[in-house]
Amino acid sequence: DDSDCFTPPEPIVMEFVNSKGENLIQNGTLTKEHFHFLQIAGDTKIGTSFEINHESRVILNKPGWIVGSTTYEALVLTKEIKFFNFTVNASKLSGKCGGNKIDNVSFEDIEAHSQNGIYQIVVE
């Protein structure tokens, strides 16, 4: 019975930086109001909630809960508005525990690097 043990999916963690690698939330350039994330479902776009953690990183909790491939649109209100899409592929965990896992995340139209489960996004 899967209900006794359940593993929630890991969140997507993004750190928004400039070309020097400086965290733009930490240095005060960007705040929560500068970000918008939308889940793309056919012709519909649905706002997706996120938070900013104590390490000045954007945390998206929802993507891993959806099995299959889900595309999101991100809007970052920097001096030049940045639009980019990212696609999350998630699958069910195998074994006796229920839950999902994120298999991979791919970014389009933006420079992104993955390190230790954190996606560093270069926006200026």
List PLM regions with ranges:
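Short, basic/low-complexity N-terminal boundary segments at the transition from targeting/disordered tails
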Residues: 16-18, 50-51, 87
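Bacterial Sec-dependent N-terminal signal peptides
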Residues: 1-13
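A residue-level signal for beta-strand positions that form part of recognition/binding surfaces
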Residues: 11, 34, 120
